[in-house]
Amino acid sequence: MTEVLFYHLQHQPLESVLPTLLQKTLERGWRAVVQVTTEERMSALDDHLWTFTDESFLPHGTDREAHAADQPILITLSGDNANGASIRFLLEGADLPSDIASYERLAILFDGNDIQALAFARDQWRAVKEGGHDATYWQQDERGRWQRKA
């Protein structure tokens, strides 16, 4: 059964949190697909993952490039799983995939300081639970550490 994780961002921006989660994904030997909602976010995230630290980068590509299926991390606007990912990250209100059960994990990241994002995440939580999936809810504390809330 797919494990669905909700990440309530409060004290760190997405640009700080997502690379860490993606690094852990690659350490497990998994492929990831990251679904965004705008071309601008796709381009910004593509640039950021190459340069987020001076010491390393995350190997990735977008579904607009050749060889999307070969990418360990694929950034997309679509609901497709072109790289055969084990985990799907949904950012900034990306819709739940119709094929949730085809993933080991589904991670939903949202800005807890944005009222609309919070309301959308609550709707997604209800839909996940009504679909019979296990879900956990993680919220950042003041130091940016994750605390399980549900």
Task: Describe the residue ranges of each PLM region.
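Long, hydrophobic N-terminal alpha-helical segment
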Residues: 1-47
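Glycine-rich, aromatic-bearing surface loops/beta-hairpins
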Residues: 104-150
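Helix-adjacent hinge/juxtasegments
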Residues: 47-86
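Terminal and domain-boundary regions
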Residues: 28, 45-49, 53-54, 131-134
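SF2 helicase motor core recognition
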Residues: 81-86, 90-102
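Short, solvent-exposed amphipathic alpha-helical segments in soluble enzyme
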Residues: 21-24, 48-52, 106, 123-127
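Structural motif
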Residues: 10, 33-39, 74-76, 89-93, 107, 111-112
